[in-house]
Design a protein with these regions (language model features):
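Terminal export/targeting leaders at protein ends
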Residues: 1-84
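Short, cationic, amphipathic peptide segments
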Residues: 4-11, 80-106
Length: 106
């Protein structure tokens, strides 16, 4: 959770970015700490440490394989970044944004 607090501005900017190309550019140039912060948030989501609404859960249900791969710490940084770059739809990112809001409220 400390990593989430340190990388809060980056996470907010990347989750709120509506333009796909800008978001991909931000992810491409993100450093290891920033990618690890996204990975940690996803891991907390998968371990059910973050209470999320059923609506958010339904948004993210379609992306369960990607979430598992991003949350898996055994995967290299490059591989986790590639999985995040492949996500082009808004459902994945808006679901993670709702998850981030739930993390910050706690």
């Amino acid at each position: 959770m400390r990593r989430l607090r340190r990388q809060r501005p980056f996470l907010q900017s990347i989750l709120k970015e509506a333009n796909q190309k800008k978001r991909q550019k931000m992810l491409t140039h993100a450093n290891a700490d920033q990618i690890n912060a996204v990975s940690e948030m996803v891991l907390n989501l998968l371990k059910k440490r973050v209470p999320i609404k059923p609506k958010t859960f339904d948004k993210l249900k379609r992306h369960k394989t990607v979430l598992r791969e991003v949350g898996r710490r055994r995967n290299s940084l490059k591989r986790r970044r590639e999985y995040l770059l492949k996500q082009t739809g808004r459902g994945f990112w808006s679901g993670l944004e709702d998850c981030f809001k739930a993390c910050c409220v706690r």
